[in-house]
A protein has these predicted regions:
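Extracytoplasmic "Venus flytrap"
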Residues: 49, 89-97, 104-124, 146-152, ...
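Signal peptide-proximal N-terminal region
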Residues: 90, 121-143, 237, 264-270
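Extracytoplasmic ligand/sensor domains, especially the bilobed periplasmic-binding protein
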Residues: 56, 64, 89, 168-272
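Extracytoplasmic
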Residues: 98-100, 138, 150, 166, ...
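Residues that mark the start of a beta-strand
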Residues: 100-102, 142, 240-241
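Short, well-structured alpha-helical segments in soluble
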Residues: 149-169, 228-234
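Short, low-complexity disordered leader/linker segments with a strong preference
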Residues: 1-101
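Short beta->alpha junction loops
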Residues: 144-153, 217, 272
Length: 272
């Protein structure tokens, strides 16, 4: 069957099916939550998170997932990471002591995109709450934030510092050009690189970059959703021409290519 996905994102058929679906598939045994209140939303999130943790834990306890005697980490859908390929001095507890878990975060807190620095503020506040409620397994989480100003060259310098001087357990990065500049090294060092704050379709490469995962929807999938919305809501105006104002970097290019790929398969939507 032909793969109709764009850049590894959600396929067009899947996106249109989701848009047309009237009911969301739910666990019949799941409790109901009041989504009209913030407390209800948080309670539902906590429930879903615990369900996920329980399922993962069961898989690890059964031996289906986790690190085997051959030092290979296995997970769902045939996911594998050969830990024998990691640096000789690597440890899966690097950056973790008896009292602390160190996480490094590069982000923009200055320059034209300084508003994105508020994400780091959110992370810090959340981790303060975690620490105030016993931490993680009794350990406090320390977030070391570096302001790269959305400049990839500065990101490289800070990532080197966080790895070599701070010996962090995990790294968080923001920005497509910034993350692309450092994710090769981060994966070579076998350092967890989760929740990248960018939707570039390069993330989600379990073979070459298994330590890197994205935080948000792929920009390629967003392009399909935009195009689907246009076709469904402007049906009486088709064909339509869509103009895009994008940044002149990897971030903007990902958006541009994603929507152009969608438009090529949908002549009623023209990309400019």
């Amino acid at each position: 069957e032909e793969d109709t996905s764009i850049g590894g994102g959600l396929s067009q058929d899947a996106a249109e099916a989701a848009a047309d679906a009237e009911e969301e598939e739910v666990d019949a045994d799941a409790p109901t939550f009041d989504r009209s209140t913030l407390d209800g939303i948080w309670e539902e999130a906590a429930y879903n998170r615990q369900q996920m943790v329980d399922k993962i834990t069961a898989k690890v306890d059964s031996g289906d997932w986790g690190v085997g005697s051959d030092n290979v980490l296995r997970g769902p859908a045939g996911f594998e990471v050969d830990l024998n390929d990691c640096p000789d001095d690597w440890s899966d507890t690097g950056g973790i002591s008896s009292s602390e878990i160190k996480i490094g975060h590069t982000t923009a807190q200055s320059g034209n995109l300084a508003a994105y620095g508020n994400i780091a503020v959110g992370w810090d506040n959340y981790l303060q709450w975690i620490n105030g409620n016993g931490g993680i397994d009794g350990k406090n989480v320390t977030l070391i934030v570096k302001d790269d100003g959305y400049v990839a060259a500065q990101t490289i310098e800070f990532i080197d510092e966080l790895i070599e001087a701070e010996n962090v357990f995990a790294l968080l990065t923001l920005g497509s050009p910034n993350s692309l500049a450092v994710y090769d090294k981060i994966n070579e060092e076998c350092i967890p690189h989760p929740f990248i704050m960018t939707g570039h379709p390069a993330w989600g490469d379990p073979e070459i970059h298994p330590w890197t995962t994205g935080l948000q929807m792929s920009y390629s999938t967003e392009a399909i959703l935009w195009g689907t919305w246009i076709k469904q809501n402007l049906a009486d105006m088709l064909p339509v021409t869509v103009a895009g104002l994008v940044m002149d970097n990897d971030f903007g290019l990902a958006y541009e290519l994603g929507f152009e790929a969608y438009a090529e398969g949908n002549p009623d939507v023209v990309s400019e």
